[in-house]
Amino acid sequence: MSGTLLAFDFGTKSIGVAIGQRVTATARPLTAIKAQNGNPDWTLIEKLLKEWQPDDVIVGLPLNMDGTEQPLTARARTFANRLHGRFGIKVTLHDERLSTVEARAGLFERGGFRALNKGSVDSASAVVILESYFEQHG
């Protein structure tokens, strides 16, 4: 086991991607994947899985602030199930509340408004999701 994890921040138009290492508990963004109504280009995801060979995949689970599910929650679960079904990899859902807010703040701090494009925010959110996962699961 390499200790490599791949994280996705599911969205209907763009899916953020991050790669991380369990040993160092660090993550970095990769290029976001465009999606059409929540359907990604599965060949790009297959390419990522072959290139990085993660032990696990983490998918952000969008929840309301009170912990209840929202319309996007079921779609993120479906995405996670499809990842597992297509590629046979272990997929873990992880609470992503406030990940986009934190990602936007970090990007703005480093690059102002110019840094706040959709793809960079989505992949930065995937980094936040993965770092949060590391904090909770080591």
UniProtKB/Swiss-Prot annotation:
GO biological process: rRNA 5'-end processing
Catalytic class of the enzyme: hydrolase
A Pfam family: RuvX
SUPFAM superfamilies assigned to the protein according to its UniProt record, in alphabetical order: Ribonuclease H-like (SSF53098)
Entry's EC annotation: 3.1.-.-
Membrane-crossing segments per the record: none
Keywords: Cytoplasm, Hydrolase, Nuclease, Ribosome biogenesis
Keyword Transmembrane helix: no
Entry GO terms, CC: cytosol
Cellular localisation: Cytoplasm
Main location (coarse class): cytoplasm
PANTHER family for this protein: POLYNUCLEOTIDYL TRANSFERASE, RIBONUCLEASE H-LIKE SUPERFAMILY PROTEIN
Function statement: Could be a nuclease involved in processing of the 5'-end of pre-16S rRNA.
Family: Belongs to the YqgF nuclease family.
NCBIfam families: RNAse_H_YqgF (TIGR00250)
Protein name: Putative pre-16S rRNA nuclease
Gene name, Swiss-Prot/TrEMBL: yqgF
